[in-house]
Amino acid sequence: MAESNADVYASFGVNSAVMSGGSVEEHEQNMLALDVAARDGDDAIELASDEVETERDLYDNSDPFGQEDDEGRIQVRIGDGSEPTDVDTGEEGVEGTEGSEEFTPLGETPEELVAASEQLGEHEEGFQEMINIAAERGMSVETIEAIQREYEENEELSAESYAKLAEIGYTKAFIDSYIRGQEALVEQYVNSVIEYAGGRERFDALYNHLETHNPEAAQSLDNALTNRDLATVKAIINLAGESRAKAFGRKPTRSVTNRAIPAKPQATKREGFADRSEMIKAMSDPRYRTDANYRRQVEQKVIDSNF
């Protein structure tokens, strides 16, 4: 069966509404009502899908990583030079603290030190008695002094000295036993003094300070230790502690903007105690415990004393 014109138009998507009417205006209106794909000669305009990525605006100042996790990233801030930049090195600042600790004056002499001093004194009295007996048994004073000097210099006795002592009844075993006992008591006494002063490190620091800045006081301390004069030992150690605290315990106040003008040196007259009883009386004064200036004056007079 032959196709009609309407069937032919329908195969191209043209319905009867397009063909209806006899005027050109009516035909145009019917064509506009159809899908654009069905219009012969018209170009279809398609809009881009939202899924297509658009190019980022070159002037967009937003942070492209603003929504990302910062973990694992290193942030670097570049300064413009208008503000100082603090750099954290991970280390805390440490100021020099050499000698910055405050010195606490020594208090009452501990019983352990007093006991050690007394035991050493008793042993020395026994040694003097041995010397007297040696002299009574015929040993000359020159020989006794030579044996003493030999031990002080060499810290031991020669075979010749042992032989001379054996001649007057002092065997080698007896002499060695006596020497060991003497050394043990001396060590106990010295350790007690060091502990009283605050320990080995503190005692060495104070003694070295005296040797450097006041050699006379250092020698006075040696003499006081040898004579077991605990009052003088205490006074000199306190003086050394206060002197060292002044030298190292305070921050310097002079700077390039505060120039120090040296004062004219003035001679100071030093006068010590007349005797030991006068020194003990001054130390027994209540001000010695409560008044730092008074205590310092007393300690200085101890050093300047000649007894």
UniProtKB/Swiss-Prot annotation:
Keyword Phosphoprotein included in the entry's annotation: no
Acidic residues composition-biased segments: 45-54, 83-101
Keywords: Viral capsid assembly, Viral release from host cell
Region (Disordered): 45-105
One GO-annotated biological process of the protein: viral capsid assembly
Short name of one Pfam family: Phage_T7_Capsid
InterPro entries named among the record's database cross-references: Gp9-like
Domain of life: Viruses
Function recorded in the entry: Scaffolding protein involved in the icosahedric procapsid assembly. Coassembles with the capsid proteins to form the procapsid, in which the scaffolding protein is found within the external shell of icosahedrally arranged capsid protein subunits. In a subsequent step the scaffolding protein molecules are released from the procapsid. Facilitates assembly by binding to gp10 hexamers but not the pentamers and locking them into a morphogenically correct conformation.
Family label: Belongs to the T7likevirus capsid assembly scaffolding protein family.
Protein name: Capsid assembly scaffolding protein
